[in-house]
Every structure is written in structure tokens, then in C-alpha cells.
Amino acid sequence: MAIGYPNGKKYAASHEVLPQQKRKAPVTYGKRGMSLEDDLNDTIAYYLTHEIAVIHKKPTPVQIVSVDYPKRSSAKIKEAYFKTPSTTDYNGVYKGKYVDFEAKETQNTTSFPLSNFHDHQMTHMANVLKQDGIVFVIIAFQKLGETHFIPFEKFYPFWERMQSGGRKSVTIAEIQDVSDQIPYGLNPRLDFLQSIDKLYF
């Protein structure tokens, strides 16, 4: 059967082969776009809203180098650099105790590199521990979907081992041995206060 257009022309079928479309991988919606920092920020916001704990993320200090003043009433930063933070990322109060911790994540599946920490952070956490504060490290192995709560007094020996010429990383087995795994939830996302309750209260 011939097909005709309203203008009277005949339809000419094209015999060109269309390129085959590539199959897309299925989309996974779990934890999409979420980092450890996002999860912790959501968690501490939940704690604050529900008056469970007061914990805040400290802003990263910035060194401003150059500022442009296009108008008297406005300023535009032209050049700035992140300073190395002198303490940890998070601090606050829970059940009358000072809480201080550092959070790190890695894509590694077998170990955590200690180069993610700095001397001044270790010194700060050791000082908090001396004052009887609750101080710990949260480490997330993103590819494994595991997040670990490690009391500082159990984490610090790994740092000392590296300082004395030993391993520059902590194996996943070592971390699992000294940590409390934090399960992912909805609200709060990463309920690390469960670990504090279990280990300190």
C-alpha cells in the first residue's frame, strides 16, 4: 500500500540503519549523592531539632588574599585559600559531656590511609581525652557501605605505630576489631549517639 502526503508527494521509505542505542545501567537510588559529611550534617540537624544533642560542624577556615570593591557597598573576593584546620570537624555537648570527633571517608576496601589525619588533629584529640571528653573517629568505607565509630583511645595506637615506622594504614580487619559499626537509617541517618551510649554511658 502506498502512502501519500497531503501535498501529493509519495512517501519514500529510508533504508538507513539507525544506530543501536547503548543499554543504560540500572539506576540505584540508595545513598545517591550522599557523602559522609552530608549524612552527619543531616544527623546532627536531627539531634538539634529533637533536642537530643547540640553538635555542630566547624567551618573550614579560609585565608582571603585579594578582595575587589566594585562598589562602596559590596565586596567581591577574588582570591582565597583554605587554611589547614587546627582541630577536628565536629564538636558539641551530649548528656552533659563534651563531644569532639573527626570524620573521614575512603573508597578503599581493604584499609584506611592514616595520611588523612594530621599531627595537630591527633594532638587536639589527645588533649580532649585528657580532659575526660568523649572523643572518637568516624570512618566510612563507601564501597563497602560500612561506617565505623572508633573511640580515640583505640584509634591512637595505629597513629603511634605509623609514627614509629610501622604501617601507614589501618586494615579493615583492625578497624572492625576496635570499632562499633554505625547502621544507616532514615532519621537519624547515622545514629552515632547509639555508639556513645553503648561505650560511654
Curated annotation (Swiss-Prot):
Residues with site note (Transition state stabilizer): K104
Organism this protein belongs to: Listeria monocytogenes serovar 1/2a (strain ATCC BAA-679 / EGD-e)
Listed name of the protein: Holliday junction resolvase RecU
Cofactor binding, per record: Binds 1 Mg(2+) ion per subunit.
GO process terms (BP): chromosome segregation; DNA recombination; DNA repair
Cofactors demanded by this protein: Mg(2+)
Signal sequence coordinates: none
GO MF annotation terms: endonuclease activity; magnesium ion binding; nucleic acid binding
Broad class of where this protein is predominantly found: cytoplasm
Reactions accelerated catalytically: Endonucleolytic cleavage at a junction such as a reciprocal single-stranded crossover between two homologous DNA duplexes (Holliday junction)
Keywords, ordered alphabetically: Cytoplasm, DNA damage, DNA recombination, DNA repair, Endonuclease, Hydrolase, Magnesium, Metal-binding, Nuclease
GO cellular component, as recorded: cytoplasm
Catalytic activity, EC: 3.1.21.10
Family: Belongs to the RecU family.
S-S pairs: none
UniProt keyword Transcription regulation, yes or no: no
